């Protein structure tokens, strides 16, 4: 997210923050009630459409603006849940190396609207399907021709989630090693982020 938002114009960043605050103020969620889930979907689609229009107006890939929107949303949400002080909030988002104009705008939102946003965001909870099992094994595909016979090992992976959905796919040996590297790097990055108070793990309540 950070390398992306560093390339955005300040006016576009302000548009994203305005939509972010609007989203956090309007999404009172109780997924036990079907009508509340429908309302959440409508709000999400509306914000997404507005973000897409703003992205197109600023000649920005909507996928990139969605990444920045989501990242800023979780920074604010976690800070509100942790109830960090204004000073710690500024110090932590500065450590993240966000653009200075974004730090200023984000700090202003946190200083002036944190009470209202906290009351709303702390009362909602969205539960997405979770990974229930992940299996993998090495398989060998035999490719034969008139002149040669080649053994091509691949990794077969199977993922299952708590909704009962299953997905099976193949990964080449090279991509499997890249996956191992990126998974290890991600775990290290998460460990580093946990040292920042507003991004530390939330305690289960």
Curated annotation (Swiss-Prot):
Q: Which InterPro entries match?
A: COMM, COMMD5
| PROSITE patterns documented for this protein | COMM
Domain COMM positions: 130-194
Q: Which GO terms describe its cellular component?
A: nucleus
Q: Which family does it belong to?
A: Belongs to the COMM domain-containing protein 5 family.
Q: What does this protein do?
A: Scaffold protein in the commander complex that is essential for endosomal recycling of transmembrane cargos; the commander complex is composed of the CCC subcomplex and the retriever subcomplex.
Complex formation: Component of the commander complex consisting of the CCC subcomplex and the retriever subcomplex. Component of the CCC subcomplex.
* Protein name (record): COMM domain-containing protein 5
Record organism:
Dictyostelium discoideum
């Amino acid at each position: 997210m950070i390398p992306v938002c560093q390339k955005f114009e300040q006016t576009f960043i302000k548009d994203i923050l305005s939509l972010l605050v609007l989203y956090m103020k309007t999404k009172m969620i109780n997924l036990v009630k079907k009508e509340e889930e429908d309302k959440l979907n409508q709000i999400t689609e509306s914000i997404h459409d507005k973000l897409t229009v703003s992205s197109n107006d600023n000649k920005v890939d909507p996928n990139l603006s969605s990444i920045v929107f989501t990242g800023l949303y979780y920074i604010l949400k976690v800070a509100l849940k942790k109830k960090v002080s204004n000073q710690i909030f500024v110090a932590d988002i500065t450590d993240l190396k966000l653009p200075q104009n974004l730090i200023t705008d984000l700090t202003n939102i946190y200083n002036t609207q944190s009470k209202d946003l906290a009351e709303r965001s702390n009362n909602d909870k969205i539960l997405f399907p979770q990974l229930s099992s992940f299996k993998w094994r090495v398989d060998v595909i035999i490719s034969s021709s008139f002149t040669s016979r080649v053994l091509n090992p691949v990794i077969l992976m199977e993922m299952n989630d708590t909704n009962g959905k299953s997905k099976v796919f193949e990964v080449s040996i090279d991509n499997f090693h890249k996956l191992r590297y990126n998974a290890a790097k991600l775990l290290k990055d998460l460990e580093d982020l946990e040292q920042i108070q507003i991004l530390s793990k939330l305690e289960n309540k």
